[in-house]
Amino acid sequence: MAILNNSVVLPVEYGREIIRGVLGRSKALELGRRLPDMRGKTYKLNVLSSLPVAGWVKNGTTPSGAADEIKNKPISDLAWQGKDLVAEEIAVIVPVSLNTLRDVENYVDIVPEITEQVVGAFQQVIDATIFFGVGSPWANFNGIVADATTAGATVSWNGTSGTSFYNAVNDAMEKVENSGYVPTAILGGPSLNSAFRKTITELGVLAGDQGEIGALPRHIDVTGGFNQSTAFAIVGDFRYLVYAFREEMEMRLLEEATLVDPATGSTLYNLAQQDMVAFRFTMRLGAAIPNPVNRVSGQLNSASTNIVASASAYPFAIITKTAGGSN
């Protein structure tokens, strides 16, 4: 174990274990697309913002005295818009009494006991931020639910049994498809299972028995970061949720620090005075929704020379549950 500035650096194998736990349980990271690790704080994504338009070569003219007709080929171009992936830090400090540590052989033995809770804390904040924008550290990143709402990609479900939820899922898929994307999953909290069990397709088949609606894989988020009162479910092309790590998990064992309340500045723990140590976990990552222009939902510009993005195009749609609906 390495000692640095009165702190203990987490052995590599424990950091990897925590990363595997976060990746395996955070639905945002499981369903999204991981990009290569960032080499700096900011990674520039080149997102297509304008597509070329091709056309038949016609409307030629024959100059006076010329034998052959001259035809002009249409001119168009490509354009890209930069989108930044910015690495921001997630952190948690876990104070532990020295009396607890005295019951084990060394400090590292307590790490597996803490790991499970650290994984849970990290996965909850990641999912809550990416899906709902809670505490978002990234400029202009409001979360998938807020951006889908702005794009008009919302479907209301009344919470009843029968075909209503089946229809709501198909309507949400249609919104994604009309935007030029292919839905890859439906995501919700635990109550999504109940909605499937009570759902009957147009053919009278229980969708819950099939496990899918429209061949769309079902995923359940149990991190505590999915607020079903805001959005009951998210349907989308999760390939367009991208993220990258700047630094994977790091842990240091603080032995002589004073921990203060971030809100008030008042002292919470004086580790040396109170015979305590604290495990400090940190991780840095960035996330973004590229949403490039495509030929399905794109629109011709005023000069009809390029295809530009539609304001209503978005790779995700949400299903909301109306008040009074039971499930």
Regions found by a protein language model. Give the residues of each.
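Extended oligomerization regions of viral-like shell subunits
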Residues: 37-39, 44, 143-277, 283, ...
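Short helix/loop capping segments that flank catalytic or ligand/cofactor-binding pockets
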Residues: 53-57, 103-105, 195-198, 288-290
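Alpha-helical scaffold segments that mediate packing/assembly in large oligomeric complexes
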Residues: 74-75, 91-176, 306-327
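Beta-strand elements of well-folded, non-transmembrane domains
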Residues: 49, 98, 283-287
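Assembly/oligomerization interface modules of large self-assembling protein complexes
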Residues: 2-92
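Short intrinsically disordered coil segments
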Residues: 59-67, 109-112, 202-203, 293-303, ...
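Protruding loop/beta-arch "assembly-hinge" segments enriched in small, turn-prone residues
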Residues: 2-28, 34, 270-327
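Intrinsically disordered or highly flexible coil/loop and linker segments, enriched in small
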Residues: 28, 51-54, 123-131, 135, ...
